[in-house]
UniProtKB/Swiss-Prot annotation:
The keyword Zinc-finger does not apply. Keywords: Secreted, Signal. This is Venom protein 4.1. It comes from the Eukaryota. Its main location: secreted. GO terms for cellular component: extracellular region. Expressed by the venom gland. Residues 1-26 form the signal peptide.
Length: 60
């Protein structure tokens, strides 16, 4: 019985921590939606530019 209670307590603690993390992450995104979008676009641009740079290297 003690083991069952311990497992339930751990699961409850994990769910609370996960919920808090999710909410704090959502708040950050809502506070800075433009900066998040800029970061994502910059990452996407970097990914797009990598194959082009490789092709230029091969042409030279």
């Amino acid at each position: 019985m003690k083991a069952l209670c311990a497992i339930l307590l751990v699961l409850f603690a994990c769910s609370v921590m996960f919920e808090h993390f999710s909410i704090s992450t959502a708040e950050k995104v809502l506070q800075n939606p433009l900066s998040e979008l800029k970061r994502n676009c910059e990452k996407a641009d970097c990914r797009r530019s990598l194959p082009q740079n490789k092709q230029h290297d091969f042409k030279e």
